[in-house]
Amino acid sequence: MNVVWKGFYSIIFLLLIASFPLLIAVENGAITFMPGQALETIQTSFLPEKFMKYELGSEIRSIPHDVVSFGMNTGILLTYSVLLAFIISFLFGYLLNRTSFSKWIRRGAAVLSVVPDFVFVFFAILFAIQLYRATGIRLISLSPTRPTLSIWVPVFTLAITPTIYLIRIIALKYEELLTEDYVRTALAKGLSKRYIDLHHLYRNLKPFLLADLKKVISLTIGSLFVVEFLFNITGLTKFIFVDYQFQKTAVGLLVISLLGLAVYILLRAILYLFEKVMIDG
């Protein structure tokens, strides 16, 4: 029942965000709050002739039909980026505590964590341009009429923020767990590093990972708008922000939320299968 109420409140919250541009108007240089106009527009959007439709120039288009293609691009970008972030952060987090310069890498990750997303996008675009000049290989297109040519440059760029966050969390927790008595006892017994990593470290690290999954996905979705816009990706960012209309904005935000939920479920399933196969299997 709590899940139903959370879902209901989430939908209401998304509708409020989508209606925000309708609540504010500028008249004679002054900002006016107009809840009546917003409520009227929302009510009108549920009329049979306007429900789940939006205007594109002089054409009336179906929102469900168009949101699928936009959502596919965003879904692929979001899923690949989060999975890549988990793979890289697990490898780095595992290796960091076995190197002498782990503290320096953690400090570097802490510094990078305050860098805005658009800076990473800028350097990714700069790298793609230099690569094209040197090799003739074109990875991206900066033309507003052409989509980006390779999904992997945006994927790697979008994965930077969650990767940095996860590296800091995993490395810190690994360092704490290595000082626990049960780990020291296992080492004293001569158990293999692989056994200790899987049965003692991973199992005690997993609750922290599950607790931070939502934050990781939220960080990635926050960066998603910047990456899609600057890389000129035909995704839900364009669907939502180009030519604002309440219905398509509300549906676009809802689809992004559902994609985030799908990625969350996928990651939990992967962690569950990893434990069953690698530890219990």
Segments predicted by a language model, with ranges:
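Transmembrane-helix boundary motif in ABC transporter permease subunits
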Residues: Y80-A110, F122, L224
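Generic hydrophobic transmembrane alpha-helix motif, especially the helices
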Residues: A109-T161
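Non-cytoplasmic
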Residues: L22-A30, A211-F241, G260
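Membrane-cytosol interface at the C-terminal ends of specific transmembrane alpha-helices
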Residues: P144-L187
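Transmembrane alpha-helix signature in integral membrane proteins
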Residues: R61-L95, L209-I217
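Hydrophobic alpha-helical transmembrane segments of polytopic membrane proteins
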Residues: P154-P162, F231-L273
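Transmembrane alpha-helices
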Residues: I11-L16, R194-V227
